[in-house]
Amino acid sequence: MAIESSPPFLVGQDGLKGYKLRTCTIIGGRGFQGRSLVSCLLLLNDWNIRIADSDPSLVLDPTELVLVDALNSRRISYHQLNRLDSSLLLETIGSSSAVFFVDFPCLKNLEFVELHEIIVEGTKNVIAACRECQVRQLIFISSADVVFDGSHSILNGSESLPYQIRHGDILMDLKAQAESLVLCANNIDNLLTCVLRPSTVFGPGDPDIIPFLMCSVKYGLAKFIVGDGENTSDFVYCENVSHAVICVVKALDYRMTSVAGKAFFITNLEPFPFWKFVSLMLEGLGYQRPIIKIPATLVWYALLISKCMQINISTSARLFHLATRTRTLNCSSAQNQIHYEPVVSMEDGIRMTIQSFLHTEQNAAFSEMEEHSKAAKLLGSGKVADILLWRDERNTFVCFLVVFSLLYFLFLSGRTFASSFPIRIRYFG
């Protein structure tokens, strides 16, 4: 197995003249953030890129035609990867000077044991493979959620914040363990490691925020503001996260001791009102801004009921916490130590995200209208139909409040049936 003992220095946009291109492996390269990183590295002309992911083969979207030339010139290659297969990891990573651990495979509907195996054990295997293959740099993309408990706001938080145990979000607990493993592996067998913690990533292909908003539109819930609507969040456009990865590589090349073994928050450096972000996205996609404020407690009880009904609410719960708490982060460490500055503003990022989803959403809108028309035919007209189909928003909202109030008093408040009886008398006369 050929090993690069020391990588050549990075150069500018014109590529390397007289030097062999560096080889990197992007684990999770077909995920949301991985695709962005591949595109950014291609523009540098400094890298041969190995895309490693769980899919059996590389299937390009119509928007990825730029990758065809790179595949033909062999600047890009695809490798199916199982993080639990050590021999496959060694084969994929071998001769790479840098490994970018960007994402995990789809983790929906998996049990704790499976999640732990993929995230924690998989990360251990990646680290071991990097050490055996004498990889120089391992950069892990984590999440700012690892220090956010969901119950308390964070104002200008720094990387010194401790990990938070979130019993309702096993995924983030396990990701915090994986992050810790990467940081602890620094400077063992000459491997330099670094962790990036982006805060609420968005962009073309976003698998969480935009699909969640579209689901809310579909079920008539996008008109609601949860809580007082005054909270502020830090977001980051996906291309800025990719740029931060490149900044870390350069920093590790030239200033190893100040960056290696550390974690850095990555944001757009533009704290943004959360509900303004939601409103701009919905308006850009052709929908009405949310205008009706509902108590956060009410929505939380609805999520608890969904959980009791064994409905997967992990994404909903995570976005609920973001929607009702302020979370702003201090990126001065990233600015000072890896010289990170966003290359795409919030305004441009929102605009490009909307444009990327418009075509998809136009197709989805037709299906949505069909569903509503079938429901309308089934329910017909009348008071009940008007309430269920959100034709009368005021009456629907009142019924919504009454139903959840009854659920709380009769089932969620901890009262017995007998102690709830006076309450029922009071409410029903």
Predicted segment positions?
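NAD(P)-dependent short-chain dehydrogenase/reductase
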Residues: 185-251, 281
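Amphipathic terminal alpha-helices
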Residues: 2-17, 23, 333-336, 345-369
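Membrane-interface amphipathic segments
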Residues: 369-429
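NAD(P)H-binding glycine-rich loop region in Rossmannoid oxidoreductase-like domains
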Residues: 72-121, 129, 133, 146-150
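N-terminal Rossmann/SDR dinucleotide-binding element
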Residues: 1-98
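Mid/C-terminal beta-alpha module of Rossmann-like enzyme folds, strongest
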Residues: 251-315, 352, 361-368
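Active-site Tyr-X1-5-Lys
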Residues: 166-194
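Conserved Rossmann-fold NAD(P)-dependent oxidoreductase catalytic core, especially the SDR/UDP-sugar
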Residues: 121, 125-173
